[in-house]
From Swiss-Prot:
Its main location: nucleus. One of its GO terms (cellular component) is nucleoplasm. Residues 457-470 have a biased composition (Basic residues). This is RNA polymerase II elongation factor ELL2. Residues 184-202, 291-318, 391-401 have a biased composition (Polar residues). Pfam families: ELL, Occludin_ELL.
Length: 640
C-alpha cells in the first residue's frame, strides 16, 4: 500500500499527473475499508507512535488476514482486526479506481503520480467494540425518541407538534343504524385478494419473481429491490439479487438499468399471480415481439422457391449459431437440414475437398426443407466452440475477471471432441433423410447442387438404402439404418469418381456460384465483433471487463450442463466402437443410446437454446478477453 502526501489539493489550481510506473513495479495498490474502531485505533497510534516501541503489522493468509495495531496503554498489548480480500470489479462492476499519490519536490512543487489500478479490496471485519458501539447508539436513539414522545409540549417549544382535533359524539342521530353513515365502504373481497396475491408471490422462487418484473420494463437495481420488497423479501434472497441479475439480465452501461435476456422470455408464465390485467396485456405484446419474428420468418421462407445464389448468404444471427462441429442428440428436423446444407467446405489451393463435394451432392432436399433460408458462412473470426481459441494466460486468483490479476482461461469444450456421435440414432426419431456423417473438421457446401442433379443422385441412394432396410429391419422400414464404415468408404470412392467424370461446366458453375455467395459483402458478423473493438482507453477496458463479469457465471453454468450431456454419448460411443456391428452387445448399446436420448429430451426441453447460448457466450467472452490481454500487453510495452 502507498500513502499519499501530507498536503491537499487546492481549488482552481492545476496539477501535473504522471501515469508511469516510475520503476516501482513492486507496489500493490489496495482499497482498504476500515471500521470506526480500526480508524480510532490507528489515530491513537499516530498520535502516540513516538512513545510506542512497536509498529503496526499486516499478515495475509490467502484471501484472509490479520492487522495488528499496538496500544498506547498498556504498551505490550495490540488491537487485532481480521479482514478479507475481495475483487473490486466483482463487488462493484459499475466502477473502478486509480490510486493517485501526491508528492512534493524539493522546490515545493506538487506532483500527482498514478500508482496503478485498484483491483483488490481489503475489508476489515467488525469487532465486539463495533457491535457495542452500535448498541449504545441504538439505545441512545431510542431514549431520545422516548423522551421526545413523552415531553410536555409548550407553546414555542422545540418540539411543537400538529394539533389534533377530537371529534365530539353526535348529540342527535336520526338514523337508528349509525353504521350506515360510513363513507367509502370497502369491499372485503378486494382486501383478501390483495393479501392472498402478495403472500402467494412471496412464496415463489426469487429468480421467477425477478424475471417476471424485468419482462415488463427495465429496472435499476435499487428500483427492482424496492419493488420486490413490496411483496416481501428475506435477507438471503436480497443478497442473491446481484447473482440472479448476472444470469438473466443485461446491464445497460448508460443508465445502469437491467433488461431481461432474450432466452429467458420462454420461461415466463402468462398467469403469473403478481400480474394485473394491464400487465398481462403488456406481457402478451412483449412476447409477440420476442417470440413471433422467428416463426414469421420460417413461415415466409416455406412459400419461397429455393434459389442458389449469393443472396442466400444473408441470414439471421440466430441461424448462424446453429453451425457447430458437435452433433447433439436433440437437434430438430428443420434446424438440422438447414445448417447441414449450408456449411462451407474446406478448400485445398482454392478447390473444394472431393469428400465434401460428394457429401453435398448426395443431399436430397424435400420441398419444405429446401425452402428454408440458408445462413451465411461463418467469417474467419468466428470461433466454433469445438475449437476454442488460445487465450492469453494469466496468473490470478479470481476466476471471474478477464484480465491480469484475477483470470482463469475459459474452459475448453470437451463435449465437441466426438462430432458425429449417434447421428443415425437421431435420424430414427425424426424420420429424416439420411445424411452421411462427416469427419471432424469437414464441412459441407454452402450452395446445393442444381435440383436435377440432386434429385437423380438422391433417387439412386434411396434405392440402395431401401433394400438395406428390408434386409435389416422390416419394423423400422421408414427409418435409416446405420451406415457402416466400410460401405461409406466404398460409396465415397464411387461418388468421387462420378464427380471427376462429370462435365466441367456443371461443377464449375457450382463452385463459381458458391464462391460468389461467400464474398465478404454477404457475411454478417456476430454482434460482439462489431460492438467490441480494440481498446484504446482504461475506461473502455473497464467497460469490457464489466460486460465479461456480467455473463461469465451464466457461461460456466451452461458449459457444465452441456459437458455433462456430451460425456454420456462419448462414453457410449466408445463402447460401441469396441463391439462388432450386428452383435447382441452392439444392439444393447444402441438401445441404451436411444433411451438416453429420450431422457435428455424429457429432462432438458430447452437444450438447443442453452447449447447455442453457451457457444455464443464462449466466443464472445474469448473475444473480450483477447482484447483486454492485447491492451494490457501494449501498456506493459509502453512502460518498459
Amino acid at each position: 500500500m502507498a500513502a499519499g502526501g501530507t498536503g491537499g489539493l487546492r481549488e482552481e489550481q492545476r496539477y501535473g499527473l504522471s501515469c508511469g510506473r516510475l520503476g516501482q513495479d513492486n507496489i500493490t495498490v489496495l482499497h482498504v475499508k476500515l471500521t470506526e474502531t480500526a480508524i480510532r485505533a490507528l489515530e491513537t497510534y499516530q498520535s502516540h507512535k513516538n512513545l510506542i516501541p512497536f509498529r503496526p503489522s499486516i499478515q495475509f493468509q490467502g484471501l484472509h488476514g490479520l492487522v495488528k495495531i499496538p496500544k498506547n496503554d498498556p504498551l505490550n498489548e495490540v488491537h487485532n482486526f481480521n479482514f478479507y480480500l475481495s475483487n473490486v470489479g466483482k463487488d462493484n462492476p459499475q466502477g473502478s479506481f486509480d490510486c493517485i499519490q501526491q508528492t512534493f519536490s524539493s522546490s515545493g512543487a506538487s506532483q500527482l503520480n498514478c500508482l496503478g489500478f485498484i483491483q483488490d479490496k481489503i475489508t476489515v471485519c467488525a469487532t465486539n467494540d463495533s457491535y457495542q458501539m452500535t448498541r449504545e447508539r441504538m439505545t441512545q436513539a431510542e431514549e431520545e425518541s422516548r423522551n421526545r414522545s413523552t415531553k410536555v409540549i409548550k407553546p414555542g417549544g422545540p418540539y411543537v407538534g400538529k394539533r389534533v382535533q377530537i371529534r365530539k359524539a353526535p348529540q342527535a342521530v336520526s338514523d337508528t343504524v349509525p353504521e350506515r353513515k360510513r363513507s367509502t365502504p370497502m369491499n372485503p373481497a378486494n382486501t383478501i385478494r390483495k393479501t392472498h396475491s402478495s403472500s402467494t408471490i412471496s412464496q415463489r422462487p426469487y429468480r421467477d419473481r425477478v424475471i417476471h418484473l424485468l419482462a415488463l420494463k427495465a429496472y435499476k437495481k435499487p428500483e427492482l429491490l424496492a419493488r420486490l420488497q413490496k411483496d416481501g423479501v428475506n435477507q438471503k434472497d436480497k443478497n442473491s439479487l446481484g447473482a440472479i441479475l448476472q444470469q438473466v439480465a443485461n446491464l445497460n452501461s448508460k443508465d445502469l438499468s437491467y433488461t431481461l435476456k432474450d432466452y429467458v422470455f420462454k420461461e415466463l408464465q402468462r398467469d403469473w399471480p403478481g400480474y394485473s390485467e394491464i400487465d398481462r396485456r403488456s406481457l402478451e405484446s412483449v412476447l409477440s415481439r420476442k417470440l413471433n419474428p422467428s416463426q414469421n420468418a420460417a413461415g415466409t421462407s416455406r412459400s419461397e422457391s429455393p434459389v442458389c445464389s449469393s443472396r442466400d448468404a444473408v441470414s439471421s444471427p440466430q441461424k448462424r449459431l446453429l453451425d457447430s462441429e458437435f452433433i447433439d442428440p436433440l437437434m430438430n428436423k428443420k434446424a438440422r437440414i438447414s445448417h447441414l446444407t449450408n456449411r462451407v467446405p474446406p478448400t485445398l489451393n482454392g478447390h473444394l475437398n472431393p469428400t465434401s463435394e460428394k457429401s453435398a451432392a448426395g443431399l436430397p432436399l424435400p420441398p419444405a426443407a429446401a425452402a428454408i433460408p440458408t445462413p451465411p458462412p461463418l467469417p474467419s473470426t468466428y470461433l466454433p466452440i469445438s475449437h476454442p481459441p488460445q487465450i492469453v494466460n494469466s496468473n490470478s486468483n479470481s476466476p471471474s475477471t478477464p484480465e491480469g490479476r484475477g483470470t482463469q482461461d475459459l474452459p475448453v469444450d470437451s463435449f465437441s471432441q466426438n462430432d458425429s456421435i449417434y447421428e443415425d440414432q437421431q435420424d430414427k426419431y425424426t424420420s429424416r433423410t439420411s445424411l452421411e456423417t462427416l469427419p471432424p473438421g469437414s464441412v459441407l457446401l454452402k450452395c446445393p447442387k442444381p435440383m436435377e442433379e440432386n434429385h437423380s443422385m438422391s433417387h439412386k441412394k434411396s434405392k440402395k438404402k431401401s433394400k438395406k432396410h428390408k434386409e435389416k429391419d422390416q419394423i423400422k422400414k421408414h427409418d435409416i439404418e446405420t451406415i457402416e464404415e466400410k460401405e461409406e468408404d466404398l460409396k465415397r470412392e464411387e461418388e468421387i469418381a462420378k464427380l471427376n467424370n462429370s462435365s466441367p461446366n456443371s461443377s464449375g458453375g457450382v463452385k463459381e456460384d458458391c464462391t460468389a455467395s461467400m464474398e465478404p459483402s454477404a457475411i454478417e458478423l456476430p454482434d460482439y465483433l462489431i460492438k467490441y473493438i480494440a481498446i484504446v482507453s482504461y475506461e473502455q477496458r473497464q467497460n469490457y471487463k464489466d460486460d465479461f463479469n456480467a455473463e461469465y457465471d451464466e457461461y460456466r453454468a451452461l458449459h457444465a450442463r452441456m459437458e455433462t450431456v456430451a460425456r454420456r454419448f462419448i462414453k457410449l460411443d466408445a463402447q460401441r466402437k469396441r463391439l462388432s456391428p450386428g452383435s447382441k452387445e452392439y444392439q444393447n448399446v444402441h438401445e441404451e443410446v436411444l433411451q438416453e436420448y429420450q431422457k435428455i429430451k424429457q429432462s432438458s426441453p430447452n437444450y438447443h437454446e442453452e447449447k447455442y447460448r453457451c457457444e455464443y457466450l464462449h466466443n464472445k467472452l474469448a473475444h473480450i478477453k483477447r482484447l483486454i490481454g492485447e491492451f494490457d500487453q501494449q501498456q506493459a510495452e509502453s512502460w518498459s
